[in-house]
A protein has these predicted regions:
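Conserved beta3-strand ATP-binding lysine motif
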Residues: 2-7
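AlphaC helix of the eukaryotic protein kinase fold
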Residues: 8-27
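Activation-segment/catalytic-loop signature of the eukaryotic protein kinase fold
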Residues: 39
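Conserved short submotifs of the Hanks-type protein kinase catalytic core
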Residues: 43-57
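AlphaC helix of the protein kinase catalytic domain
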Residues: 58-68
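Activation segment signature within eukaryotic-like protein kinase domains
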Residues: 76-77
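Protein kinase catalytic-loop region centered on the HRD/HxD motif
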Residues: 82-92
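C-terminal lobe helix-coil module of Hanks-type protein kinase domains
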Residues: 139-239
């Protein structure tokens, strides 16, 4: 059972959003999103029922166990993407994807909380001009919320990538400065720290996928969540640094010169043993 906070009952906007949560949640159907349970009783106070999900949040896992294995992270990311697609199919954005809102149960991830969900059409009619600050958590919300730019599915992608980065590193990609950034100038000077700096076991191509999904400019992120997931699973040549590529690709001339030198040396050694003795 979820009930509204007593401290916020005097806030009409909060009460309105709370009432909307049940309706929003009832529209979403996915094994990776917490389910709204229909109440058969006549209600005498404000509440709604949700599925009981046993398990630990991703934040619990990180705080108690540190970084998580890449294979598990990819599996959980797959689950979260399936959950987010359920929102996106209903023209909704979750807007508050963060480690505390993802529960792990039997090795699978489930998205919880509907308090910040944006529903196309509905929000435009009910949202006041004063309600410009994002309802989600600043540390994980995409820059466009604070810059008052259009929010899209790529906004959820950014938040998801923040969570994936934290699962793999127990850190955040832009440091403490990200949460404090509120304008274009502040966002423009942010420095992305590669995931493998914090965790050397992270492949460079996985970091490349994270870096793309975490672009401050939403236009530079992935077109779809499936592309992001694919690049987490399989190496994308675009993200392989020159140093990681074979010598024949980096410098064909040097490769063939080196190979020729090896062959010549091999021939000389053979001749020495045949005629030098």
């Amino acid at each position: 059972m979820k009930t509204p906070s007593v401290l916020c009952l005097g806030d009409p906007g909060y009460v309105e959003r709370f009432v909307m949560e049940e309706w929003v949640g009832s529209r979403i159907s996915s094994p990776h999103v917490v389910e709204i349970v229909k109440s058969e009783r006549k209600r005498t106070f404000l509440y709604y029922l949700i599925e009981m999900v046993e398990g630990k949040t991703i934040m619990d896992r990180i705080e108690k166990g540190g970084v998580m294995e890449l294979a598990e992270v990819v599996t959980l990311t797959d689950n979260m993407i399936k959950g987010l697609r359920a929102f996106h199919r209903r023209e909704s954005l979750h807007q508050d994807i963060k480690p505390d809102n993802i529960v792990i149960h039997n090795g699978k991830a489930k998205i919880v909380d509907f308090g910040s969900v944006f529903v196309a059409g509905v929000d435009e009619m009910t949202r006041s001009s004063e309600d410009e600050i994002p309802l989600g958590t600043l540390e994980y919300s995409a820059p466009e919320y604070r810059l008052n730019r259009p929010r899209t599915e790529r906004s959820d992608q950014f938040s998801l990538a923040m969570v994936v980065y934290e699962m793999l590193t127990a850190k955040v990609p832009y440091g403490e400065a990200y949460e404090k950034s509120m304008n274009i100038k502040q966002f423009s000077v942010l420095t992305y720290t590669p995931a493998y700096v914090h965790n050397p076991l992270i492949p460079i191509w996985v970091d490349g996928a994270l870096r793309k999904a975490l672009q401050v400019n939403a236009d530079l992120r992935y077109d779809s969540l499936s592309e992001f997931l694919n690049d987490l699973k399989y190496p994308n040549e675009t993200f392989l640094s020159p140093e990681m590529k074979p010598l024949i690709e980096r410098n064909p001339l040097l490769f063939w010169k080196g190979l020729s030198a090896v062959l010549v040396a091999s021939q000389l050694v053979t001749l020495f043993f045949l005629f030098g003795a």
